[in-house]
A protein has these predicted regions:
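Short catalytic-loop micro-motif centered on adjacent basic/acidic residues
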Residues: 107-108, 172, 274-279
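Short, conserved active-site entrance elements at the starts or edges of catalytic domains
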Residues: 177-228
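Amide-forming acyltransferase catalytic core, primarily the GNAT-like/NAT-type
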Residues: 11-61, 198
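Aromatic (often tryptophan-rich) hydrophobic motifs at membrane interfaces
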Residues: 218-285
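Acyltransferase donor/substrate-recognition loop-hinge adjacent to the catalytic core
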Residues: 123-197
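Short, Lys/Arg-enriched N-terminal segments with co-localized hydrophobic residues
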Residues: 1-11
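Short, charged/polar "capping" segments at the starts of alpha-helices
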Residues: 113-120, 285
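Conserved donor-binding loop and adjoining core beta-sheet/short helix segment
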Residues: 40-114, 224-252
Length: 285
């Protein structure tokens, strides 16, 4: 989403704060007031990726406003998250002015159909919209991820069948008894990976989620093979009808391990939730 030229804005002095764990009640309050489905609109997501994307926030006219930076110079902000007595129009204009004062192009990310409608009601015609295919969320029916029926899931089912024939495993919930094992597994797996852009940021995000598992109120599942944890997944409810999977890691030495933790986590933890947002593509055509 980009600013259309020729629209007036107000001048403000806005201070943005770094996100820390103590801010969870503030974020949870704003996110709870409306039915959000995109994975970015959770405190966990913004907290664990705060270093990677330099995420900061402020409150403007009872709107939660979050800004970020991707790479060296791609600055952006998320749509304001309105409170109970908010002025989205003023919040938007303040964000625009902040970006202009700092010489940043005015770019907003994380737009959904619902937030676009909110923006068009508050500031009609101010923005033009472009599809961001690289950051689509992928939402599945939970029962589909559990049973993997049909041609669409045939490849995943084959991976699981091969896994079951090859390995003896146990599933267990993630908790205080095995968090440290999950941390050590992640560190060990990362040692064997070639350095690629974003890999270190991913490691930081995974470790933040694990080390703050209880405080973030996450749920998790893990697979144990040969006495060691070889896969784990972490998620939470984003609304009463949808869970979001924030983290999914597995030892690729075990064929089908990713497919197996995906299926097992859905079955053991989310079977009573209609939908699962996996944040990004599973590789299903």
């Amino acid at each position: 989403i980009y600013l259309r030229e020729g629209k007036g804005v107000v001048i403000v002095d806005t201070y943005f704060k770094e996100i820390d764990l103590g801010d969870k009640p503030v974020f949870d309050h704003y996110f709870s007031l409306r039915h959000y489905e995109n994975s970015e609109f959770t405190f966990t997501n913004m907290f664990i990726w705060r270093y990677a994307f330099n995420l900061r926030f402020t409150i403007i006219e009872d709107c939660l406003c979050v800004i970020g930076k991707f790479g060296k110079d791609f600055h952006y902000f998320f749509p304001p998250i309105p409170g109970e007595n908010s002025r989205v129009d003023i919040a938007v204009h303040n964000l625009i002015q902040y970006f202009k004062e700092h010489g940043y192009p005015v770019v907003m990310k994380g737009i959904t159909h619902a937030t676009r409608e909110m923006l068009e009601e508050a500031v009609p015609g101010l923005f033009r919209y472009e599809r961001d295919f690289n950051n689509d969320d992928y939402v599945y029916r939970t029962e589909d991820l559990i049973h993997l029926r049909g041609k669409k899931y045939h490849q995943k089912k084959n991976h699981i069948n091969k896994f079951l024939k090859s390995y003896q495993y146990t599933y267990e919930p993630v908790g205080e008894n095995n968090i440290e094992e999950c941390i050590q597994a992640e560190l060990e797996w990362m040692k064997n990976k070639d350095p690629i852009p974003g890999l270190e940021d991913e490691k930081v995000a995974v470790l933040e989620a694990l080390r703050n598992f209880d405080a973030l109120k996450l749920k998790g599942g893990a697979l144990r093979i040969d006495g060691k944890i070889q896969a784990f997944s972490l998620g939470e409810l984003i609304n009463p009808e949808m869970a979001v999977i924030h983290i999914e890691k597995a030892n690729t030495r075990y064929h089908g391990c990713y497919a197996m933790i995906n299926q097992q986590f859905a079955e053991h933890c989310w079977k009573d939730v209609p939908y699962i947002n996996r944040e990004e593509d599973m590789g299903i055509p």
